[in-house]
Each structure stands twice: as structure tokens, then as C-alpha cells.
């Protein structure tokens, strides 16, 4: 059984070790903003050639904040559908994991 925490040799502080993430676990659902950003990122790069990655993110954030609720609705719908997909996949994944554990 792995240790939950270990003292760091350099600072003496207790460090928590993260559990290894299962590569077969379902991917989390994207937020409405992430759907918007993924769709608009290329447009922002074309309109602002030579800007840094961070600046692209700032511009996307400003554009997202400027959207009305009506303009955000399609992205919110995509996010809700993706959340449902994630919950369904996670439920199936957990059922499969419980089944393997009991075997």
C-alpha cells in the first residue's frame, strides 16, 4: 500500500502524492467557454498574427465576456450535452471497475 504523504527532504513539509490517473477513465466534459475558445481560437490567431499564446487567451476571454446570453446558448447546450456524455461514461466506467473489483 503506497504512502499517502511523505516529508520532502529539502523543505521538510509534508507532500501529498497524487494517485495515478487511469488512462482508460472517461475524459471530463468541456465547459461552454472551452467550446467557444476551441471554435474561435483560429479566428483570433488569423486576426492577430504574431500574438503570444497568453494574449490569444486574453482576447478569447474578453470576447466570451462580451457575448450575450443568447449568443452563449449554443455553447451552453454543447457543454450540457458533453456533461451528460461524461456522466454516462463515468457511470459505465465505475460499474465496470466495481465488477472487476468484485471478481
UniProtKB/Swiss-Prot annotation:
Pfam families: HMG_box. GO terms for cellular component: chromosome; nucleus. InterPro entries: HMG_box_dom (IPR009071), HMG_box_dom_sf (IPR036910), HMGB (IPR050342). It is found in: Nucleus; Chromosome. One of its GO terms (molecular function) is DNA binding. GO terms for biological process: DNA repair. Keywords: Chromosome, DNA damage, DNA repair, DNA-binding, Nucleus, Transcription, Transcription regulation. Residues 26-94 bind DNA. Residues 70-91 have a biased composition (Basic and acidic residues). DNA-binding protein that induces severe bending of DNA. Required for DNA-binding by the FACT complex, a general chromatin factor that acts to reorganize nucleosomes. The FACT complex is involved in multiple processes that require DNA as a template such as mRNA elongation, DNA replication and DNA repair. Also augments the fidelity of transcription by RNA polymerase III independently of any role in the FACT complex. Belongs to the NHP6 family. This is Non-histone chromosomal protein 6. It comes from Neurospora crassa (strain ATCC 24698 / 74-OR23-1A / CBS 708.71 / DSM 1257 / FGSC 987). The gene is nhp-1.
Amino acid at each position: 500500500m503506497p504512502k499517502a504523504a511523505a516529508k520532502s527532504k529539502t523543505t521538510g513539509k509534508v507532500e501529498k502524492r497524487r494517485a495515478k490517473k487511469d488512462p482508460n477513465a472517461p475524459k471530463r466534459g468541456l465547459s461552454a467557454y472551452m467550446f467557444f475558445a476551441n471554435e474561435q481560437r483560429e479566428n483570433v490567431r488569423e486576426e492577430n498574427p504574431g500574438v503570444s499564446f497568453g494574449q490569444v487567451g486574453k482576447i478569447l476571454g474578453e470576447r466570451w465576456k462580451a457575448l450575450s446570453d443568447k449568443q452563449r446558448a449554443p455553447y451552453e447546450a454543447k457543454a450540457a450535452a458533453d456533461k451528460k456524455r461524461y456522466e454516462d461514461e463515468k457511470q459505465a466506467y465505475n460499474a465496470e471497475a466495481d465488477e472487476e473489483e468484485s471478481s
